[in-house]
């Protein structure tokens, strides 16, 4: 995972990691993951995805988007975009965060998906004990939902 210097896991107040095996090719998983405008249709912890820079519905390098997740509205910018392997964006709102995704082929036509997030700022520093398990649960929902849709076919 490519981490921005300010979000190295060892130097962050909150760090969460989730992983799942998906019986779908990395390219298909990638297409679902970058189609951010459609996240609310299959990932219940996202809403109101609006692009302020970029070409909806898909993320691309330097795309900026505002969205609601975990009950908070955040502004994000894509800073890592390496199809179909790695995607990452920062997030700013009541905290600063970096959320990265890694898609690794499994050699059998499927892939392993790893998602990691680091958070910094006053809120994560004070509430790390609450935020970490919340992120892990929310991101587990995300990877399980990604598995379900990707194994079902390509996005429309």
Give each language-model segment a name.
Residues 25, 70-72, 83-84, 94-95, ...:
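Short strand-connecting beta-turns/loops that link adjacent beta-strands
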Residues 17, 37-73, 81-86:
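Short beta-edge strand/loop motif at the mouth of beta-sheet-based domains
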Residues 91-148:
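Beta-strand/loop substructures that line and gate deep hydrophobic ligand-binding cavities in soluble
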Residues 1-54:
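Hydrophobic ligand-binding cavity/cleft-lining segments
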Residues 28-33, 39, 65, 78, ...:
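Hydrophobic pocket/interface hotspot
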Residues 18-20, 75-80, 98-105:
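Hydrophobic/aromatic beta-strand elements that line small-molecule binding cavities or substrate pockets
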Residues 50-51, 147-156:
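Short, highly charged C-terminal tails/helix-capping segments
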């Amino acid at each position: 995972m490519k981490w921005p210097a300010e979000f190295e896991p060892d130097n962050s107040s909150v760090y969460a990691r989730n992983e799942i095996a998906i019986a779908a090719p990395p390219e298909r998983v990638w297409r679902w993951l970058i189609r951010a405008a459609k996240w609310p249709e299959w990932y219940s912890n996202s809403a109101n995805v609006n692009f302020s820079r970029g070409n909806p519905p898909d993320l691309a390098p330097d795309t900026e988007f505002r969205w609601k997740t975990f009950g908070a509205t955040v502004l994000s910018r894509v800073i890592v975009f390496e199809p179909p392997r790695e995607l990452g964006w920062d997030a700013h709102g009541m905290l600063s965060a970096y959320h990265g995704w890694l898609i690794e082929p499994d050699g059998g036509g499927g892939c392993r998906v790893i998602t990691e997030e680091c958070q910094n700022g006053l809120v994560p520093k004070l509430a790390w004990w609450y935020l970490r398990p919340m992120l892990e649960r929310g991101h587990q929902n995300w990877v399980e939902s990604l598995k379900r849709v990707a194994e079902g076919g390509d996005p429309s």
